[in-house]
Amino acid sequence: MADAESQNGENHLPHKIYLDYNATTPPATEVVKAVEEALREAWGNPSSSYTAGCKAKELIDTARAHVAKMVGGKPEDIIFTSGGTEANNMVLFSTVENFNSTSKERQNNRVALALPHIITSNVEHDSVALPLLHLQKTHRAEITFVPVSTVTGRIEVEDIISAVRPNTCLVSIMLANNETGVIMPVGELSQCLASMSKERSAQGLPKILLHTDAAQALGKVEVDVQELGVNYLTIVGHKFYGPRIGALYVRGLGQHSSLLPMLYGGGQERNFRPGTENTPMIAGLGKAAELVFLHCAVYEAHMRRIRDYLEERLEAVFEDRIRLNSRFPGAERLPNTCNVSLLKPAMLGHEWLSHCQYLQASIGAACHSDRGDRPSPVLLNSGVPQEAATSAVRLSVGRETSQDDVDLIVRDLEQAAQLLGVNKKSLKKLP
């Protein structure tokens, strides 16, 4: 996607090309319109009975229905949050609190379990990994970080099942990785956990709930909570052309899946997330979800075609001087994600990007942008060699990225590599 930079006179320079859609996306035109209309017409308190308040409540109800439809759930199972970080934290801390609140009942059944045990992977987003490390450090939970396969880049179901203990109460596995694009076998995992539940229940052991952070998957591939079989699913608006708020899907909220509030206040969102609702942003999220529900297959096909073309051009130009880090045998991946390293000469990923004139991309997760010269732990944990991980660049295409955009940024990357000392004769010239 070319940005809106101005051009001077007849000097028609190429625009900047944004290829960091895994970090964030621009709000869709329809989303901006929905937000603006809500600001003008639905500024009232949704709990009030006057016109502007009733309009706000109507917009919130409509948005909730659209978000639920996008993930194949029910409107009553959707809780609006400030974003993915809050949604993830709600699940993790609720699980610990609920485990502790039911410990007396288990003791009466002569099943004494000291601390709750949570299983996750070693490639999770910081909004999952860091709260879990905090719970571990403060001796409030036992945490197991299961390594992903260094062959497939994905978590293996049997490794998760092998990590289950009597006190296991939650498994949290992302639906798709933000750096490699690898899609995790969450649906298969839920089936295995469900088959264990009857035996565990007979033994008086806690039910194992399943959470997935779907931030990277939504808007790129179809996401259906019925097929996934999850108890919790995290939704992040700004990853699919919506505003920077989020939502949490909770299967059978209050019945099949427990949730406790992190905040206490006015009772909004059925007391699970109090505070006067952010109507304009919720309306925007609902519109973004509606667009995904209607057009996801089209978005996916376009992004896959452009991503594949991008990788073809990179291989044609750089040949064996690059490594495509997001290609793992036997693993599915997001249709828009390409993680690539320039190996000859060895260089840091951010150095390569800094010499590009038109490309706007990143070396990985935005929350790790301050890691300096250190390679991505996610890539290392996924089996990417140290040299490649150090020089990695993440290119993620969007709904409007074109082949012309790809041609320009591949040429840009080639010229940047040349500036960094790559022998021009060793590279094929672009036509």
Swiss-Prot record:
Gene Ontology CC: one annotated term: cytosol
Where would one find the signal peptide in this protein?
Answer: none
Q: What are the positions of the active site?
A: C367
User: Which reaction equations make up its catalytic activity?
Assistant: L-selenocysteine + AH2 = hydrogenselenide + L-alanine + A + H(+)
Major localisation:
cytoplasm
- Highest taxon in the source lineage: Eukaryota
Q: A Pfam family this protein belongs to?
A: Aminotran_5
Tell me where in or outside the cell this protein is found: Cytoplasm, Cytosol
Q: What is its EC number?
A: 4.4.1.16
Transmembrane stretches, start-end: none
Cytoplasm listed as a keyword? yes
Subunit organization: Homodimer.
Q: What is this protein called?
A: Selenocysteine lyase
